[in-house]
A protein has these predicted regions:
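Non-catalytic, C-terminal membrane-associated alpha-helical segments of glycosyltransferases
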Residues: 224-227, 241-303
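Acidic donor-binding segment of Leloir-type glycosyltransferases
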Residues: 23-66
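Short aromatic/hydrophobic "clamp" motif used to bind/position activated sugar donors
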Residues: 89
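Active-site donor/metal-binding and catalytic loop motifs
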Residues: 196-233
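Acidic donor-binding loop at a coil-to-helix junction in glycosyltransferase catalytic cores
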Residues: 181-189
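Glycine-rich, basic loop-to-helix element that forms the pyrophosphate-binding segment
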Residues: 67-84
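Short, flexible, basic/aromatic active-site loop/helix in glycosyltransferases
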Residues: 119, 135-155
Length: 303
């Protein structure tokens, strides 16, 4: 049973006041339970967002921390872990929402484990989002809210949001701060936990995810994450299907063909992905070709 908790929310250009209010209400109603909610702003450039989030400081046991410089997902999470005062940490992304009034109680009553992951859930069949690539991508994939599927691959299906971890473990094995740009810091963290024999318990306690950026932005963020993957490809071997498929293409002596095709096919595929009829099949093809294309730019050395 978990009776103390530091709820840690990193944010960047996102208003998360309602999320904090929902969590604060739940925490305040739990018996024999000590808590704090820390929100760390990673150098937001949207001043109106910062202004709205300042109201978090008016809530009991809540604190909004402004940081001047954007330092990335790994640094901000490690910072929050150091700022926290309780034995247990709950990390939540600021663009998630509470969908269960017993969310914190479920964690409180869970059997203790080094890491506990609750997953996330996307509401399906939203007509207004049928042209949104990120939404389609989430719906086509394995639903992260299904804890039984996640438990079958406990380290591979782990994300650094909506998870509880002992503070001592987080401080001993912090996120790798070389990850300055978007993507894959959670994958390497899962690998670190596995290598150090730290168990992850997957439970049915999802948060909602309903923040679906536009198609162009999503493709751009995907490209950024693939550059991160390429940079850390040696350490992420065995933890990325893209690396696995790219290695097979190289063994089949098809890499040069893919590199030559990318300049020809990338623009029409990207136009389809950013339009009103995006295709997950083409999205997967684009990701693989873009990753292989990075070898043309950077060669055998890291970025």
């Amino acid at each position: 049973m978990i009776n103390n908790l530091s709820i840690l929310i990193p944010t960047y250009n996102n208003v998360c006041l309602e999320l904090v209010k929902d969590l604060q209400v739940q925490a305040s109603l739990l018996s024999d339970f000590s808590y704090e909610i820390l929100v760390a702003d990673d150098g937001s450039t949207d001043k109106m967002t910062v202004k709205e989030n300042l109201a978090i400081n008016d809530l009991e046991n809540c604190r909004y921390i402004e940081r001047e410089k954007n330092e990335g997902r790994a640094v901000i999470r490690n910072f929050l872990a150091k700022e926290a005062k309780y034995e247990w940490l709950l990390f939540i992304d600021s663009n998630m929402n509470v969908i269960n009034s017993q969310h914190l109680r479920n964690y409180q009553m869970t059997e203790e484990c080094g890491v506990i992951y609750g997953g996330y859930q996307v509401k399906r069949n939203q007509e207004s989002l049928k042209h949104n690539l990120r939404y389609i991508f989430e719906c086509k994939g394995i639903q992260n809210g299904d804890y039984k599927l996640r438990q079958a691959n406990p380290y591979g299906d782990f994300h650094t949001s909506n998870f509880i971890i002992k503070r001592s473990i987080m401080l001993q094995y912090p996120l790798d701060e070389r990850f300055r740009y978007y993507g894959y810091e959670d994958v390497l963290f899962g690998k670190t936990l596995k290598e150090n024999h730290i168990n992850i318990s997957h439970i049915d306690n999802p948060l909602g995810y309903n923040h679906f950026i536009g198609n162009m932005t999503f493709v751009t963020k995907t490209e950024e994450s693939l550059r991160t993957l390429y940079q850390f490809r040696d350490e992420l071997q065995g933890y990325s299907k893209i690396i696995t498929y790219a290695s097979k293409i190289e063994r089949w002596h098809l890499k040069t063909i893919c590199q030559k095709l990318f300049p020809v096919l990338s623009l029409p595929i990207k136009a389809r992905l950013t339009g009103n009829n995006p295709s997950i099949f083409l999205f997967n093809i684009y990701k693989l070709m873009y990753y292989i294309h990075l070898n043309t730019i950077y060669g055998v050395t890291n970025m």
